[in-house]
Amino acid sequence: MNTDKKISRREALKRMGFAVMSSAIASSGLLSLASCETKRSKRIIFYFTGTGNSLYIARQLAGENAELLSIPQMVKRGKYEFEADEIGIVYPIYGHMPPYMVRQFIQKAKLKAEYKFAVLTYGARKCDAVEIWDRISRKANNAFDYISTIIMVDNWLPNFDMNEQLKIDKHIPENLQKITADINSRQHWHEPVTEEERQQHQGFMQRSGLDPEVGFLMKS
């Protein structure tokens, strides 16, 4: 006795369509748990800007997906704990040192990230700014994997002629392109400092009488 049940053409097509759809979903990985857990890299960039140079660099490094956070705003709100795949900081060099508020921020901050980078902007002299930041950040248990400087138009008007500065080709686009490529590939590198640059900073500190633990008390 034949117990097989005949199905209609409509039912057969329905079942066939379901089978094809299931196969397509499985092959595309939509049913994979791993695909559900995939996430895009998150980058946070903190910035301190006095004349706009550092904000410009921070925006260029941020691209479309990173989060830009103002250091003065974070200090004002008392926010110091952050976590991301990558954390960066951009600030201007004042007397070869970080601005006092940047120093305050890094000393209190708890930054959890697989990769940390810092880009320091300056207009004339950087001296041993990279080593100074490395010491300060390490002392605060916030060591950085990548530290670089980039020379910009020096727009601190009391000391420099803006028109003359604009005539000088400082290769900003080329330098920024290299820094961006380094950071995107997570290079581990600190810009080298010469002994001459260290001596220049020591001489500056002696002449200026600045407290090396404070630096310039300049606001953003």
Model-derived segments and spans:
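Conserved anion/nucleotide-ligand pocket segment
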Residues: 165-171
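Short, structured loop/turn "capping" segments at alpha-beta junctions
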Residues: 144-145, 186-194, 215
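Acidic/polar active-site rim loop that often engages polyanionic ligands
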Residues: 152-163
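Ferredoxin-like iron-sulfur electron-transfer modules
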Residues: 40, 201-220
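Helix-loop-strand module that forms the ligand-binding subsite of alpha/beta enzymes
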Residues: 72-154
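N-terminal secretory signal peptides
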Residues: 1-11, 35
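N-terminal export signals
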Residues: 13-34
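C-terminal segment of N-terminal export signals and the immediately downstream linker at the start
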Residues: 28-50, 56-64
